Amino acid sequence: MAVRVLVVDDSVLYRRVLTDALKSLPDVEVVGSAASGSSVLPKFRELKPDLITLDIEMPGMSGIEVMEALRREALEVKVLVVSALTVSGGALTLKALERGAFDFITKPSEGSAQENFRCICDELAPRLRAIARRLEVQTILRRGTPPAASVAKTAAVSTPAPLLRRAPIAASAAASNNHQPELVVIGVSTGGPNALQTIFSALPGDLAAPIVIVQHMPPIFTKLLAGNLAAHSKLPVREAAHNEALSPGTAYIAPGGKQMRVVPALNGRRLLQLSDDPPENCCRPAVDYLFRSVANHFPGKALAVILTGMGEDGTAGLRLLKRGGSMVIAQDEASCVVFGMPKAAIEAGVVDLVLPLEAIADRITALVRGSQS
């Protein structure tokens, strides 16, 4: 089943680049394009796309206004924001994500035409695969009882029932080590800004542990995300700085384009270190890079949380954290935008608790305070 895509961009060049990139991907059909926001609704009604790639900064009717119009009309379509790597582009992109955009990609600002084309293809490919999987599941659900082959396929992406049944036992076993978490580490990708906002708006201001976060995002965007989260949280939230000492009750977000690790320092302090080390799992910052540092230097002292996102980043690091006695929480499938990173961790057997997004903040608070309730 091909994903039907409508390309919206006021730039003739980018309409052509995006169209060519999408056409190079399997199971994708570009059904049309639009040069302005005002033409999106008529084009949508005519072409019935599954996905709109939406330039967020357009003259006249902006990308944000397009999203608001789609929401007012209750039109069912995924939106993939296409943004410039600028402060204004980042701020508008975060607004679009708050309004329900599926995800975003950035327009390359450097490199040759061929390199930029390949970069766009690489960014589009996993997102289109994730959208295709969601559309397939939605189609199956609309049909009611799926055929046997479809049941097998959807079962493969569901949270394993045996894991859910044994989760309280696993949680008790982790707690019996008497390792009240001194540090919370979070890994997240697609759907992350809204997921993090849900969690941080519910955390208390007196949480006695620092929180260290890797969110897959480019430079500029992570600093804006930290500001947005701080506005919705009782805790201070900021973009991490090199050699910054961790403070209880403060959250730190890895800067886009940097790897981040936690290392021990004098007097029992913990420092954040940033580097230009190579990407892992095609990501910088990478969740595995952070989790591995915590597992190596602070075994059994962390609570790890893996949230919505594409791919498997975080699973290898969680395996090390579990081996050292740390506890792991994964977001459940129903509340994920993309059930990729949590699914990989669950299937690897490195998760103690699978929880809906709305329950994660309370569980973090209880564990840090030394309560299992």
Language-model features: where?
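Conserved residues in the N-terminal Rossmann fold of short-chain dehydrogenase/reductase
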Residues: 35
